[in-house]
Amino acid sequence: MLNADLKQQLKQLLELMEGNVEFVASLGSDEKSKELKELLTEISDMSPRLSLSEKSLKRTPSFSVNRPGEETGVTFAGIPLGHEFNSLVLAILQVSGRAPKEKQSIIDQIKNLEGSFHFETFISLTCQKCPDVVQALNLMSVINPNITHSMIDGAVFREESENIMAVPAVFLNGEEFGNGRMTIQDILSKLGSTADASEFENKEPYDVLIVGGGPASGSAAIYTARKGLRTGIVADRIGGQVNDTAGIENFITVKETTGSEFSSNLAAHIDQYDIDAMTGIRATDIEKTDEAIKVTLENGAVLESKTVIIATGAGWRKLNIPGEEQLINKGVAFCPHCDGPLFENKDVAVIGGGNSGVEAAIDLAGIVNHVTLFEFASELKADNVLQDRLRSLSNVDIKTNAKTTEVVGEDHVTGIRYEDMSTGEEHLLNLDGIFVQIGLLPNTSWLKDAVELNERGEIVIDCNNNTNVPGIFAAGDVTDQKNKQIIISMGAGANAALNAFDYIIRN
């Protein structure tokens, strides 16, 4: 089931195993069970440290990744290929005794959790944000014997996932726990375990502190580090919103990559320099004093720096119409690559006629029964090549001059109301899912009145990426820069870094 290149890479990774690992599989006579057995046999044959046995488990087909004679609580229900293959490889290494890369403080938090925690995560193999959650919960299961975790492929266990309309969907002890991308710190926080602020107490002031972890942040950090400046990053995750991007084909010199690969490469590049990257933590306030610029973190710690570059990016913009908020993850979705497979053979709408919306409609048309694309303006704004492709599809309708007014449904989406602005008539369209693709909302709510914002909530900057506060710079999608592109954000990050360097020299 694995191609030659992947087998070669896997064989090298399996050499990092530090102990024996046993696959315990629950298999039937169905096709998926046969595929799973083929995969596990193929992997087992690649290392003398791996073995395969069979046993009846809660779900079939599924398998646990155990140490000989010891259950670890790590289970995969389905066939973990696609984006989840890395989750399987990582689980094998960690169960074998390979030390995780998490900070010791995080490991201690996991060890100190009291109680029994049985997690189940519904995923799709095309979901790019699912592996983060799966890998976090698998690691927690390996570290703490009171924690178990099962990854469940919704495409294989359709009855169980019938009412799952957004992935990853995490359940704890049978109750809904959370949806969407979560870091291991997010999970610990939801369990009531707070991060220790003591590790930040003795940090020396920075020359440049960058808030955010996306392309602008990474570019800025590398540029300032190369200038010999003491550089820090405070971010929820390296890569930012790019982690949720499927294909990237317009980053010059790289013909094609994915958001996950891009983010991984960005993190590796940052690691090559003396950059203090503090991930899994968010900033909650910023203040300029006579002595320094102070950034307060969500754990109460305060970091000081001569300059700060704000590069917190942007998140999905919502419709802000009745019914939307309460039906998010219950039919209202923002990621067609993640959640599209959950709407197979169903009717959906895409809101937004720009490149993102049209690309989403094209992708979904190959999965769902029917797509209706809504655009507020009189014509689509997407590139012509995308519009031509969209109009060639037989299961897509396009509605322009359409103002969406209400998401309809109680426990899940059943329809959408919209106004035809050319006639004033209101209509109800029955459907199962709505994918919102109307642009981005800057992550600036934490700034309060610290710097000047425009009417859209974006940070106002000049050509040197200065804000209205000397020493505080901003770059990327969080700013009022018109075009929001990865390559433009990276250029903006570099520009902000060079001007921060110049500011330090002159002050």
From Swiss-Prot:
Key words of the record: Disulfide bond, FAD, Flavoprotein, NAD, NADP, Oxidoreductase, Redox-active center
Required co-factors: FAD
Keyword hit for Oxidoreductase: yes
GO molecular function, one term: NAD binding
Cofactor mode of binding and number, as noted: Binds 1 FAD per subunit.
Free-text function comment from the UniProt entry: Serves to protect the cell against DNA damage by alkyl hydroperoxides. It can use either NADH or NADPH as electron donor for direct reduction of redox dyes or of alkyl hydroperoxides when combined with the AhpC protein.
Family: Belongs to the class-II pyridine nucleotide-disulfide oxidoreductase family.
Subunit structure: Homodimer.
NCBIfam families: AhpF
Protein name per its UniProtKB record: Alkyl hydroperoxide reductase subunit F
Organism: Staphylococcus aureus (strain MSSA476)
Taxonomic classification: Bacteria, Bacillati, Bacillota, Bacilli, Bacillales
